[in-house]
Structure formats: C-alpha cells, structure tokens
Curated annotation (Swiss-Prot):
InterPro entries: DNA_helicase_Holl-junc_RuvA_I, Hlx-hairpin-Hlx_DNA-bd_motif, NA-bd_OB-fold, RuvA, RuvA_2-like, RuvA_C, RuvA_C_sf. This is Holliday junction branch migration complex subunit RuvA. Belongs to the RuvA family. Signal peptide: none annotated. CDD domains: UBA_RuvA_C. It comes from the Bacteria. The keyword DNA damage applies. Residues 151-199 are annotated as: Domain III. HAMAP family: DNA_HJ_migration_RuvA. It is found in: Cytoplasm. The gene is ruvA.
Length: 199
C-alpha cells in the first residue's frame, strides 16, 4: 500500500494530478476538493489509496486524511466504487458530507450524480452513527484541536488494526470503547496496544 506521495506537482487537472518523484511521474486521480486545495503549490504531499483490479492499478489521492477516511467509508458500502466515491467528494467537501449523513439528508446525498435513492439511504444507514459520533467529539471549539488529534490518531489506529487482521467493525468497537469518556491523550502506539489487548 502506498500511504502518500510527496514530490513536485508536474501537472494539475480537475480530475487528476501528476506528481514527479525523482523523475517518475505518478498519475493520481483526485476530487475537486483536493484539486482546489493544491492550488499552484510547487511541492505537494498527497495521501493515497491504491485500487487494484485485474486490468488496472489506480492511485486515488487526497489533500488530507479526513477526505481519505471518507473515501474509504464510502467504498465500504455496497454499490459505491472508487470512481463514484470520488464523484461524491467532488460534489461536497468531507465536512459537508459528514454533516449531510449525520442529519440523514437523503436529498443532498441523492443529488450526486450516480447516487440513487437506495444507495443514498444505504450511505446514511451504514455511516450515520459514525458521523454523529464524530460530530459529538468535535462538539465545541474548546475541544476542537483535541478532537482533530483524537480523530486522526483513531483513523490511523483503525487502519493499522485492519491491516493486522481485525474486521473494521471489531476494530471500531474496540477503539471507541477505549476512547469513550477518556480525556487523556493517547499516542498511536498506546491506542493500538490497548485495542490488541481487547482481542
């Protein structure tokens, strides 16, 4: 898995970028959100997801980890492939998408090209609890920096646990139990170790 690519921005297009890393150009598909974040930077660091099919290996890129996390949530839902997930993230930024899911706004999600009523309902059904939980964590401005740090570490720990063989459901449950009501700051290593002890 290629976690991120850092290098010179050789080409930028609303649907893809080319990043030059020591003379090798990586073609990376991006959303409009990421495209707008890159602006005209000379050097970029893009978080990536490598999608492997029999006939193609495709890199998808994200300006930040929140967008990558939303992409992975979307592609975990039946009927939504990487291409459709990118269209969703081009239609609204990650925060807008989280809010639409949390308030169960079927109409907004269904307005995205390629998303029908049943798929929009499935997105809400499968992700609403997670989005509402995130919204509570980020509830007040005074806790905002803490929640961003918490969510970032949680996201990285979740990826690590899945790589170690946990199902996503079990990994999320363990992490939420550890973090619930605990105001102490965790290091990524501590969080993973505690989750492993719960298996």
């Amino acid at each position: 898995m290629i976690a991120y690519i850092e290098g010179k921005l050789a080409h930028k297009d609303p649907t893809f970028v080319v990043v030059d890393v020591q003379g090798i150009g990586y073609h990376i598909r991006v959303s409009l959100h990421t495209f707008s974040q890159l602006k005209d930077l000379e050097r970029v660091k893009i978080h990536t997801f490598l999608h492997i099919k029999e006939d193609a290996h495709t890199l998808f890129g994200f300006a930040d980890l929140m967008e990558k996390e939303m992409f992975l949530h979307l592609t975990s839902i039946s009927g939504i492939g990487p291409g459709t997930a990118l269209v969703v993230l081009s239609s609204m930024n990650p925060i807008e998408l989280k809010e639409a899911i949390a308030r169960e706004d079927v109409k907004t999600i269904q307005s995205v090209k390629g998303i029908g009523l049943k798929t929009a309902q499935r997105v809400i059904l499968e992700l609403k609890d997670k989005m509402k939980k995130d919204a509570l964590l980020a509830g007040s401005d005074s806790k905002q920096n803490f929640s961003v740090s918490h969510n970032s570490i949680r996201s990285e720990a979740l990826t690590a646990l899945i790589t170690l063989g946990f199902t996503k459901t079990v990994a999320e449950k363990n992490l939420d139990l550890i973090l619930k009501g605990n105001s102490n700051s965790f290091t990524l290593e501590d969080l993973i170790k505690q989750a492993l002890k719960m298996s």
